[in-house]
Amino acid sequence: MLPVFLRPAARKDQLDMAEYYDAEAGEAVGNRFIRECDAGVERLSRFPESGTIVRYKHPKLEGCRSILVPGFEKILIFYRPLPERIEIVRILHGARDIEWVLN
């Protein structure tokens, strides 16, 4: 099992989305979002190659893969499998212009 490093931008994404779900759907949904993100990341530590290879041209996503957050199927966790760890790059809604968000 590889250690996981959550980049600051990814942590902010996660907390911002949890806050949004808290406000729009209630605290239970916000908490479930955090739990499902954490469960997805934990699975990546065991199966780092399980995500889909991303095809964006943005350099921040070079070498990245993505998985969907279970129960929140439009939310993507972008990560980079490295020999020594899994690096979580961003957690973003799939309907957004991903490359624009990264600029």
Task: Enumerate the language-model features and the residues they cover.
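Short alpha-helical
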Residues: 12, 28, 39, 62, ...
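Short, hydrophobic secondary-structure boundary micro-motifs
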Residues: 30, 52-56, 100
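Enriched for short, Lys/Arg-rich terminal
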Residues: 69-103
